[in-house]
């Protein structure tokens, strides 16, 4: 997910997106622990997307 896509969303939309990605990250971690995750690099991407969203939320609230 690109930061350009994220910065155009409202704070409420960002929070919903963050919640969805957090749930997806949780599921990916469970699958990875039992060996069913085919692409473990996906976890890193999800963590980075959540961090980008958190950054965008802080920037919007600071305005």
From Swiss-Prot:
Pfam families: Ribosomal_L29 (PF00831)
Cross-referenced InterPro entries: Ribosomal_uL29, Ribosomal_uL29_CS, Ribosomal_uL29_sf
Keywords recorded for this protein, A-Z: Ribonucleoprotein, Ribosomal protein
Gene3D superfamilies according to UniProt: 1.10.287.310
Gene Ontology cellular-component annotations: ribonucleoprotein complex; ribosome
Keyword Ribonucleoprotein: yes
Recorded superkingdom: Bacteria
PROSITE patterns: RIBOSOMAL_L29
GO biological process, one term: translation
An example molecular function term from Gene Ontology annotations: structural constituent of ribosome
Entry similarity comment: Belongs to the universal ribosomal protein uL29 family.
HAMAP family associated with the record: Ribosomal_uL29
Name under which the protein is recorded: Large ribosomal subunit protein uL29
Organism from which the protein derives: Bdellovibrio bacteriovorus (strain ATCC 15356 / DSM 50701 / NCIMB 9529 / HD100)
